[in-house]
Amino acid sequence: MHTVEKIGGTSMSRFEEVLDNIFIGRREGAALYQRIFVVSAYSGMTNLLLEHKKTGEPGVYQRFADAQSEGAWREALEGVRQRMLAKNAELFSSEYELHAANQFINSRIDDASECMHSLQKLCAYGHFQLSEHLMKVREMLASLGEAHSAFNSVLALKQRGVNARLADLTGWQQEAPLPFEEMISSHFAGFDFSRELVVATGYTHCAEGLMNTFDRGYSEITFAQIAAATGAREAIIHKEFHLSSADPNLVGADKVVTIGRTNYDVADQLSNLGMEAIHPRAAKTLRRAGVELRIKNAFEPEHGGTLISQDYKSEKPCVEIIAGRKDVFGIEVFDQDMLGDIGYDMEISKLLKQLKLYVVNKDSDANSITYYASGSRKLINRAARLIEEQYPAAEVTVHNLAIVSAIGSDLKVKGILAKTVAALAEAGISIQAIHQSIRQVEMQCVVNEEDYDAAIAALHRALIEPENHGDVIAAA
């Protein structure tokens, strides 16, 4: 049986190493096949095509959406073209491959440019609104980056004697989009995995519109659906690092250990903290299909990485990972009139959802509720103002916080709460709130934002390092 493997954009930018470590490595003959690869755009390309993920700096899409002038988005699109052509020149030294790579991406960019120009012209008439078509434009632009890296991968593999074949899921010039699952199954029906190494685009054009729901998380959704639809033996995500017991930059590279084995429940907890091993919807697809997920370091191919399965539970209770997130605001709502009235929580939760604020956790007592939410300061302040307007008697306070968590497939460790509190106290860190559910999979400590780094190091030192796990907590 085959595997389905995903390679992220940062790894794809180190393409020669990816060829040597993942695509080919020491494999020969039949060992090269029975694999499907789902590849992302090269690092930075999607930022240029849409907008910068972290800074918000406008790319082609954002300039087009602002519609100030056609020149602005055209200039940005030409800038992307030059970056893509430069990447081609970096990858291919032979004239044939370079010409093929350039011809492919030039054709796609020309088509996109013509389409956007025509749409802008059409929307100059009052009967047509540009805003109604923007999501389609966003998806079309995103697909350029995915198609670029996938086409180049096939070209490079063929150059090295591998029978590689492109699965172009971008729907380019397709008459009408198919439903997502049908789009995947129809594309993969004709492949012979025993003789063909398949490279698929991370973006799938479909009737539902993946970006409507997942925005830039679409590649993992595509990856998971391919694994489920084709009955993969295993799904593998190649990252630039191991799934480790903590961030090595915070606790020291010599202190962290690879997790080795865990379950989808732990992956969900990590996702809730914004430290995604895999998108929760993708995990759900794999889990339902009974496909196990392996997280590997792209640049350590011989290492087994970490295997995530549905039923795994550590042999003895232990903490597997210390993780957290910094960008958390505590919205504290105090109102003595809320005693016994569940309507407060329902209405405020609805308001936060409308503002698209992500609630990591919440706690309450007799007359107060605190929501630990992630989002921009501007939106958080707006939420606080709207809550005050809705409940004039309430006192609403916003706190700058961080959440630090101890997570494990079986966290029923005797005295873990006492150890945690003692470790943070010894590090001079004040706990603002603490959460531990009956299921004993995660324990969250809420601390002041400036204490985040020290709290991660303190908990790793107290809860993981004394166990002397060696290189891996549980071998995959």
From Swiss-Prot:
Notes on activation and inhibition: Allosterically and strongly feedback inhibited by tryptophan. The presence of either 650 mM NaCl or KCl reduces the inhibition by tryptophan.
Protein name in UniProt: Aspartate kinase Ask_Ect
Localization annotation: Cytoplasm
Enzyme superclass (EC): transferase
GO MF term list: aspartate kinase activity; ATP binding
Reaction(s) catalysed by this chain's protein: L-aspartate + ATP = 4-phospho-L-aspartate + ADP
Assembly: Monomer.
Source organism: Stutzerimonas stutzeri (strain A1501)
Pathway linked to the protein: Amine and polyamine biosynthesis; ectoine biosynthesis
Protein origin, superkingdom: Bacteria
Keyword field: Allosteric enzyme, ATP-binding, Cytoplasm, Kinase, Nucleotide-binding, Transferase
Boundaries of every ACT domain copy: 405-476
E.C. number: 2.7.2.4
